[in-house]
Amino acid sequence: MKTRKKTCLCLCLALLLCLVSCGKPASPGEESGSSVTTQGVSSDAQGLTLADGLSITEVFSYAGPYVEDGSGDPCENICAVRLRNDTAEHYQYLEFEIETENGVYAFSASTLFAGAQMTVLSKNKDAYTGAGVRSAKLVTLAPFTKTPTVHTDTLEITYTDGFINVKNLTNGMLMNVYVYFKEMDDFGYLGGITYRTGFGDILAGDTVQSGAANIHKDTSRVVFADYSE
């Protein structure tokens, strides 16, 4: 088994995800490619509608690890939302805002699959004290341009706390292999951030291990992988 380490971290928009130290926040546009649209939004008594089938079901004050920058630092009273995707579309990246009696809160989220739910924290760590929500606005929406997959026919991906192993199941070399993962909680995905870990080129039949500081055996989930041939 070969062992490689990679380090990095970010969650922004050149359009998409996030990566962190050998499990770095994936940068927008670094995944499978996407097209970006900008839209407005409406609100109703049932919640906040960002787009058809895309809604905020709850706004609340969050306490726990701050996941959006990959640090996991303790935080409390941070503005957070429950985001729900009831469409048939997989979204690679989105940015949105909510306006409350106390001001505007900004959010970024990535890898929101069809039918999925996600808890997203204010990207500026803004505090929330229960102020009434007036409206919401969708700033950026970018669907995946190809269906995300973990490639179970060509890759065998396993992980433990802090490490990911990838085996090439094919008869040829796979180049620029990346694995993307997210944290989970009882609601669904925890954090808009998506982590990315690179493995370089993997020869036929070989297994490569890479450190991924933010992956946890019991609370993380690999959401997709990517490579070139």
Regions found by a protein language model. Name each.
Residues M1-C10:
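Bacterial N-terminal signal peptides that target proteins for export
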Residues L17-S21:
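C-terminal motif of bacterial Sec signal peptides marking the signal peptidase cleavage site
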Residues C22-E30:
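Bacterial lipoprotein signal-peptidase II cleavage site
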Residues D44, N124-F163, N214-E229:
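Terminal connector regions
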Residues D73-A80, T158-F163:
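Short, solvent-exposed loop/turn segments enriched in Ser/Thr/Gly
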Residues R82-A88, N165-N171:
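Asparagine-centered strand-capping/turn motif at beta-strand->loop junctions
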Residues A88-G103, G172-Y189:
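Short acidic, flexible loop segments centered on an aromatic residue
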Residues G103-T129, Y189-K217:
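Intrinsically disordered, low-complexity Pro/Gly/Ser/Thr-rich segments with frequent PxxP/GP/PP motifs
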